[in-house]
UniProtKB/Swiss-Prot annotation:
A single BP term in Gene Ontology: malonyl-CoA biosynthetic process
Chief location: cytoplasm
Entries under Pfam families matching the protein: ACCA
Subunit structure and binding partners: Acetyl-CoA carboxylase is a heterohexamer composed of biotin carboxyl carrier protein (AccB), biotin carboxylase (AccC) and two subunits each of ACCase subunit alpha (AccA) and ACCase subunit beta (AccD).
Keyword Nucleotide-binding among UniProt keywords: yes
The gene coding this protein: accA
Function: Component of the acetyl coenzyme A carboxylase (ACC) complex. First, biotin carboxylase catalyzes the carboxylation of biotin on its carrier protein (BCCP) and then the CO(2) group is transferred by the carboxyltransferase to acetyl-CoA to form malonyl-CoA.
InterPro entries: Acetyl_CoA_COase_a_su, ClpP/crotonase-like_dom_sf, COA_CT_C
Domain of life: Bacteria
E.C. numbers: 2.1.3.15
UniProt keyword list: ATP-binding, Cytoplasm, Fatty acid biosynthesis, Fatty acid metabolism, Lipid biosynthesis, Lipid metabolism, Nucleotide-binding, Transferase
Keyword Transcription regulation: no
The name this protein goes by in its record: Acetyl-coenzyme A carboxylase carboxyl transferase subunit alpha
Length: 325
């Protein structure tokens, strides 16, 4: 059963009523088809109203949904012959990041992504999708391998952020993230990044320096969580909803600001409602991106990536220049 979110409460009672009538029809000699059809029509109308008017905080809840498809869910649906690679060849293997070699419609590719768990046991094993330095170093090892063998790189971003623990800092968390940013900027193969859930801080950006950056419609991408921003700005984490509306963290906001290239539509209610259909939407956008990028040589790919990131923040720079005059 799909867990309902806070803003979906108006829909819950209607869904429950429809289900009760369907169950009653199975056991009683009564035809309630007409009543059920009316309720389903009412439910559809209400769903359209709710999902068409989602607030940034509503989208944060969807991005964090415990049943939202993960990197491995999409790998299973989009790629064939996936062979997972382990370890950073320096310290160990971080299961908060998965990566390996796969075929995408006959094209050899390298796939890398954050991986959170679906239950408590798996979340503990994968550290809730928050990587240690060895996770980022594993990702970079696979990226350099992909460059050596001319394989396109596809990154799935889904993390609250890099793990901030003492051990992670001792092993060079900030250096690992910075090294990824530096090296990804100069990769001579196509890099396509897709935010599929939460894109939190440097932990997300360490897999986010791509030629094309796409976001699922209800995903988020930000330097800090709404709770963290509220705690810093107003000394009150309970004001997270206000922070979410202020921070411009949604796909629509970031498309307007030029941070991302395309918004990938989600199935009604969020990707967790139908992972198969959601994978088809990702496939459509990914296929178009690779077709465009594979036409460029290595030097052109690096230049395109450089120009893309250089243009971010250009509007604010111009505004500051005008004020200075």
């Amino acid at each position: 059963m799909v867990a309902e979110l806070e803003f979906e409460k108006p829909l819950v009672e209607l869904r429950r009523k429809i289900q009760e009538l369907k169950e009653f029809m199975k056991t009683a000699d009564v035809d309630l088809s007409s009543e059920i059809e009316k309720l389903e029509a009412r439910l559809t109308k209400l769903e359209n109203e709710v999902y068409a008017n989602l607030t940034p905080w509503d989208r944060v809840q969807i991005a964090r949904h415990p049943q939202r498809p993960t990197t491995l869910d999409y790998i299973e649906r989009l790629f064939t012959n996936f062979f997972e690679c382990h370890g950073d060849r320096c310290f160990g293997d971080d299961e908060a990041i998965v990566g390996g070699i796969a075929d995408y419609d006959g094209l050899p590719v390298t796939v890398i992504g954050h991986q959170r768990g679906k239950d408590t046991k798996e979340n503990l094993r994968r550290n809730f999708g928050m990587p240690h330095p060895e996770g980022y170093r594993k990702a970079l090892r696979l990226m350099k391998q992909a460059e050596k063998f001319s394989r396109p790189i596809i990154c799935f971003i889904d993390t609250k952020g890099a793990y901030p623990g003492k051990a992670a800092e001792e092993r060079g968390q900030s250096e690992a993230i910075a090294r990824n940013l530096f090296e990804m900027a100069g990769l001579t193969v196509p890099v396509v990044c897709i935010v599929i859930g939460e894109g939190g801080s440097g932990g997300a950006l360490a897999l986010g320096v791509g030629n094309h950056i796409h976001m699922l419609e209800n995903s988020t991408y930000s330097v800090i969580s709404p709770e963290g921003a509220a705690a810093i700005l107003w000394k009150d984490a309970s004001l997270a909803q206000r922070a979410a509306e202020t921070m411009k963290i949604t796909a629509h906001d970031l498309k307007t600001l030029g941070v991302i290239d395309e918004i990938i539509p989600e199935v009604k209610g969020g990707a967790h409602r139908n992972a198969d259909e959601q994978a088809k939407e990702i496939d459509r956008v990914l296929r178009a991106s690779l077709k465009q990028l594979l036409a460029l040589d290595g030097e052109a790919l690096v230049e395109q990536r450089y120009e893309k990131f250089k243009q971010m923040g250009q509007v604010s720079f111009l505004q500051e220049t005008i004020r200075a005059r």
